[in-house]
Amino acid sequence: VCSSDLYKYDADGALVPAMAESYEVSEDGCTYTFKLKEGLKWSDGSPLTAHDFEYSWKRVLNPEVGSETAYTLYGVIKDGYECFVNKTVSVDDLPIRALDDTTFQVELKAPASYFLTLTASTAFMPVSQANVEKYGEDWANSPETYVCNGPFMLADMKKDESYTFVKNPNYYNADEVQIDTVNYVFLNAPETVKMAFDNGELDIATSVNSDALKAYTGTDKLMSSDRIGYRYYEFNCSKEPFNDARVRRALTLALNRKIITEGILQDATLPQLYGWVPYGIKDIVDPTQDWRDVVGNAFEENVEEAKALLAEAGYPNGEGFPTFSIKYTPSTELENVAQAMAAMWKQYLGLNCEVTAVESGVYWADETGTRASGDFDIAYMGYTLDYPEPSAAFTVLENAEGKAKTRWDCPAYLELCNKMRSDIAGQEREDLYKDMEALLAQECPVMPIYNYVATALVSERVKGFTRNANGHPNFEYCTIAE
């Protein structure tokens, strides 16, 4: 809503220039030089230049900032990992540079055919250096301090209640933006959301429960599309018995995902997931098809194999297996799913699993939290990828204590990740991704359960509303019929 990248996705989902006018790539595929559009401005009217992009990208890779999205950059940018993780390279020495006000250049550690898609993701969006330095940690906390460069800007903010955005007159494409105001209202109860939409109080509802699905399925008001994210569970691979891949795979194969999605969650629109790459990503060889559909499942539910693996690991019929737990944040939905998983493991494998809700602040805390400190056996996680390419999924598991907190150490996987960042393309890249999923299906540091779906109820008077692959709403191309 408020930010725009070098590139963006248009109304048809095509990658097109936004802040950038054009780009060039060096012969070795490692240096990208972007030419920015002339006359770009921040929402306060101040100039937006290549220096803002240099500052912003370096800020994400600055270990003192501690950005959670840094892995997206350090996975491809030369010396990024050494800067953010190893701290052996100064952020000032990174090969991210403004050559002049409209020319921005970056060097990659290796050719990456998907790099341009990264420049349309959240981690790569610019922030105003002047604004961040003036207001510090509060730079984005109020309309008075927040300067942006997207189609809309923040006009009013009532925390946990509502946000009001108004058209940004300084947006480079402002003449094409037809809506003057977007009001975001936070309604906690799904039934309240449905009632508000039913009564015409909402033009768009992005929280759609099972009752709303039943009421609007088959109508033009229900909008649904794949979202490149999923619900999954992490194993703590540093703790016995979950340091044994056979145990992790056994628990993964013993889950009936259809019961979870259609029975427990009562949502038949949620695709069950049998691989680490979610639906909603175009195939490498044939981009008219979904990668997941072309490649097929990386594993299948198989209780007999699960029993055999558990016996091979020294726990025949679950004998001698310690009581363990699933941890999650307080939620009736998450509790019901955890109870169902525990019941399946008890029924099929003879295992005793406790379910434990942990207060959200404790669960998600950066250093001392449940996941960050490793205080779990199995932990709930939900995640939406930063960009629509399989590499975005594989990068999540590259660092044992990065975005995923699995504490999984696998040199063979790291070797494949390094190969992933080479200049291979086409069928060779597709085969590499298959190999990476096959390895994950054997090692199982994580258990994918189901794919997210971006559903919304959209009033008949709204035209042109879209959501990108991340599920983020896009109002740039919307019109409202009076």
Which stretches of residues belong to each language-model region?
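Detector for C-terminal structural segments
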Residues: 254-286, 333-343, 368-482
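Ligand/substrate-recognition segments at binding pockets and active sites
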Residues: 159, 303, 307, 311-385, ...
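N-terminal lobe/hinge region of extracytoplasmic solute-binding protein
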Residues: 1-27, 147-148
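Surface-exposed binding/hinge segments that line
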Residues: 35, 54, 68-130
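Gly/Pro-rich hinge or "lid" segments in bacterial periplasmic/extracellular proteins
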Residues: 11, 101-102, 107-177, 181, ...
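Ligand-site clamp/hinge motif
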Residues: 169-215
